[in-house]
């Protein structure tokens, strides 16, 4: 995949248009790394390029303290209408204001999982997470999804690998 950051001119601008067009031609996955302020621009690109698979990195960084009312959560859930969009659930630790098991993000994770289904959600580790997130080890980050959320076998299979294998490797 190609990770796309937001530049000074916004997300939906001529350079992005060319990149998305080319991604559609070659079958590349766009990994959209952006804040909540750019979700409207992302929606416009998703509408124009339905053939381009897209991963929403960190789900636009919800704020754990805002719970299910958080605007990034609400908009991420609304964007589930775009079938080519996959939610990357890395915010489980990044957005948390607590220590392991980062329970203040669990309701948000479940809400997004319910909207997209495990076939359109992927786990991300923020590897090397010990470098970026001093409050979490790789094992703890993984355990949030493997143990703490109470996901079923099929949900775990999708979120912890199956969806990524299909998306990036056609498996």
Predicted regions and their residues:
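Residue-level "edge-of-site" marker
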Residues: 7, 36, 126, 159
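Glycine-rich phosphate-binding "P-loop"
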Residues: 1-11
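Catalytic pocket-lining loop regions of alpha/beta-barrel enzymes
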Residues: 9-122, 131
């Amino acid at each position: 995949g190609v990770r796309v950051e937001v530049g000074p001119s916004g997300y939906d601008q001529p350079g992005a248009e060319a990149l998305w067009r080319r991604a559609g031609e070659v079958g590349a996955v766009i990994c959209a790394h952006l804040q909540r302020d750019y979700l409207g621009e992302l929606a416009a690109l998703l509408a124009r390029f339905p053939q381009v698979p897209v991963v929403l990195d960190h789900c636009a960084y919800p704020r754990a303290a805002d719970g299910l009312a958080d605007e990034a959560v609400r908009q991420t859930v609304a964007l589930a209408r775009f079938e080519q969009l996959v939610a990357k659930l890395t915010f489980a630790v990044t957005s948390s204001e607590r220590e392991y098991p980062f329970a203040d993000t669990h309701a948000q994770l479940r809400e997004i999982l319910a909207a997209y289904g495990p076939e359109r959600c992927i786990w991300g580790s923020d590897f090397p997470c010990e470098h970026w997130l001093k409050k979490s080890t790789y094992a703890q980050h993984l355990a949030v999804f493997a143990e703490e959320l109470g996901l079923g076998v099929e949900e775990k299979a999708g979120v912890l690998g199956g969806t990524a294998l299909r998306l990036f490797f056609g498996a």
